[in-house]
Amino acid sequence: MSVRQESVGQATAARSRARAVAPPEIREHRIPTQGSKPYIAMEGFDGGLWFCESGTSKIGRFDPKRASFTEFAIPTPNATPIGITVGGDGNYWFAEKTGNKIGRVTPRGEFTEFALPTPNAGPDGILLGPDGNVWFSETEVSRIGRITPDGTITEFKDGITPGGKPLSFSQRDGALWFSEAAGNCIGRIAMDGTVTEFPIPSHDSQPRATIAHPDGSIWFVETSTNALGRVDRAGKIVEYKVTTPNASLRGVAVGPDGDLWFTENFANKIGRMAPDGGMLGEYEIPTPASGARCITAMSNGRLYFTQWDAGLIGEVIPR
């Protein structure tokens, strides 16, 4: 499949003039347990924000209406949970990077854990697939795993760049798309395990978070090259520079307005980009050096992001 080789500079010059937007309000909520190091977060079945506490081996839930937290301790100590997703069974599934397990937790906080067949696989990203199974990345061994609701695990390695370090997933066209942080590409895995890779034009871009856009494209952050990338339906990749140099982009989400909202770890800002690549703004996070990581949009029209270093959940209210 062909890949559009358009540089970051070309894409920046080609974008339309960005529209004027009002800055959002940013609020912060402190997680009760000190040293929680929140990582991936997503909206649950109940309208709460469910997230992994990588520093304290817990699964957290934030109630947006009451601004309150509930925390559930994972049975395995020092499991380092990273990714979390809703399952087709009404439960939540998560990846234990150090524990080398896939965990399942009910809405009431009851846990089941499944050990991975490959030692030190380093499971990271995780997402419910269109086939009803949960898929996850095995970052340290460059494989993609699949777990059925009853706990049967299958691993796929063919077609993935050796040492590519797959990370984040998004769903499109009946398949899952994923980033390869060391492989410098975006991958696509069909439900039969067939993998296709799409090289990113910029060298050593370190793609991380991905998100599916309603227009059918897949967006991703490039941590090393300070840009957002876009994969269209034909597999062509275009990259768009962000304004602040060396911002260290980590998470990306599609807001209720269709814009791309993203976290800037080093710059300690929340960025906003139009779907045509035009920068709309960058907004300071109140807490300095907060360690902004994942950002996710919720059905209440707001976005929430994790602050790994500060132990906070950030709330973005677009205006």
Regions found by a protein language model. Name each.
Residues 17-34:
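A short helix->beta-strand "capping" segment at the edge of beta-propeller domains
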Residues 27-31, 70-74, 111-116, 153-158, ...:
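A short beta-strand motif characteristic of beta-propeller blades
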Residues 34-46, 77-89, 119-131, 161-173, ...:
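Beta-rich, blade/repeat-based domains predominating
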Residues 51-55, 92-98, 134-140, 178-182, ...:
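Conserved beta-strand positions in repeat-built beta-propeller and related beta-rich domains
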Residues 58-61, 100-103, 142-145, 184-187, ...:
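A short loop-to-beta-strand structural motif that recurs across blades of beta-propeller domains
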Residues 63-67, 105-110, 147-152, 189-194, ...:
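Short loop/turn segments that connect beta-strands within beta-propeller blades
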Residues 291-319:
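Blade-level signature of beta-propeller repeat domains, shared across WD40, Kelch, NHL, RCC1
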